[in-house]
Amino acid sequence: MKFSKLSITLAVILTQAVFVLCGMKNEDFMEKGLESNELHDAIKKPVNSGKPDTERLLDCVLSRVCSPDANCCGLTPICKMGLCVPKVGGLLGGLLGGIL
């Protein structure tokens, strides 16, 4: 494979640009520490006292008995044997639906 001189030059320039940007980010981090870090800002936010959506949804699905005409937890799942079962498409959904 032959590379033209222009493509090699562009690759070197882009690589140097990436190193410069990473160096600037690292320099900013070294000066300000975690104060400039977005993750640190997210950690400092107050914790919501309510359960996260996935936990609430899981509790609802696992603890709720349904009837065929009921809307289980707002998921519009399938009601199988009195339990809310989320709709899963494809081969996996067919296998899981057949098992339940």
From Swiss-Prot:
Molecular function via GO: calcium channel regulator activity; sodium channel inhibitor activity; toxin activity
Tissues of expression: Expressed by the venom gland.
Pfam families named in the record: Toxin_23 (PF08093)
Residues making up the signal peptide according to the UniProt record: 1-23
Keywords of this entry: Calcium channel impairing toxin, Disulfide bond, Ion channel impairing toxin, Knottin, Neurotoxin, Secreted, Signal, Toxin, Voltage-gated calcium channel impairing toxin
Protein purpose: Potent inhibitor of insect, but not mammalian, voltage-gated calcium channels (Cav).
Name of this protein: Omega-hexatoxin-Asp2a
Biological source species: Atrax sp. (strain Illawarra) (Funnel-web spider)
